[in-house]
Amino acid sequence: MLGGEVFPIHRLDKNVGGVMIYARTKQAAAALSKAVQEGTMVKEYVAMVHGTPTESGDWSDLLFKDSSKNKVFVVKKERKGVKKARLEFKTIRSGEDSLVRIRLHTGRSHQIRVQFSSRGFPLVGDHKYGSRDDKKEPMLFSCCITFPWKGEDKRFEALPDWADK
């Protein structure tokens, strides 16, 4: 096992699995954090949602986080604490529950969960945002991260078992 510090570059909600990026040096952490801030680190997710969204979409919303409830809401007007959120998605498989692939342009707390739920497509297993099924946690997975590193794009991918079914 290698010794030394490890620096997480981004976060995932507690009940979300998938690809994470860590740095082994402070210099690498600074460079990767800059990629996140500048939007050159591309994060993609897969999710299983209730219902059938359109074939693809580009959604922008204003989100407000109520920290006392650890819940996020879509709101109509900008005010203190409101943040802009944007994502794009493609429906991969549609039906009563649909598989979608999502590209985040912003990384807001609970962003994917609340943006889909607010349009009537809560994530399967996401009881906080409207799912009424028997799954124990949201079917949401960080499946791909791409970022520039030393002149070339690095890409890391993984899929959950449920995305293949």
Where are these regions (language model features)?
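Short histidine-centered loop motifs in beta-beta connectors
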Residues: 100-103
